[in-house]
Amino acid sequence: YCQLWDWTINALHEITEYNPKIKIALEYKPNEPRSFSLMPDVSTTLMAIKEVGNKNMGVVLDFAHVMYADEMPAYSANLIGRYSEILGVHLNDGYGKWDNGLMVGSVRPIQIIELLVELKKLNYKRAIYFDTFPDHSGLDPIKESSTNIKTFKRLNKIADKLINNSDLNEAISNQNASQSFDIVQEYLFK
């Protein structure tokens, strides 16, 4: 594994050195059913980027991969924003045991809202796109895409209202989970 890590870091260094104007994105994922992942989580990925040492490397944050890695999406986004750069966001959803690729907000709408709030705090202006698998469940891909867009717009409007909500910010500062949850639900279930 150490040799594999060294080869990977050296290859990424060579790739990023080739043209420093081109951004190179890493997308971490815990594993696949029959394979091991060298960068299974945000911490390992950020460590790799630091070791590569070039500014043109960042991270694609995939919501389902973050859940699969047992991470909190907003916290992972914050760490990436602090130590590197978010170069893309895959919005989808899942149960956290596999890369489900479900429709946006179908399982974890509150975590998606929290992620969207964090992305706004980070002044994220790059692409947000959907990494879902309509073909796995026989859905019409056009209808599913339309539903993803509609849901994203709804959740993003809620995030816009929550980012500067003084009651929510106070509840968070006081670590009052009940009050925070009540405030978010008030907007989510209007």
Show which residues each predicted segment covers.
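Active-site acidic/histidine proton-transfer and metal-coordination neighborhood
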Residues: 1-58, 68, 178-189
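Alpha-helix capping and helix-coil boundary motifs
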Residues: 3, 20, 72-75, 137-143, ...
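Alpha-helical packing segments of well-folded alpha/beta enzyme cores
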Residues: 4, 8-11, 15, 115, ...
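A structural motif corresponding to the C-terminal end of an alpha-helix
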Residues: 14-24, 51-57, 115-125, 155-162
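Hydrophobic faces of well-ordered beta-strands that scaffold small-molecule active sites
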Residues: 24-26, 57-61, 87-91, 126-131
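Gly/Pro-rich active-site loop or hairpin
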Residues: 35-46, 65-125, 133-147
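C-terminal helical cap(s) of enzyme catalytic domains, especially alpha/beta-barrels
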Residues: 139-162
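Extended, intrinsically disordered, low-complexity segments
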Residues: 156-190
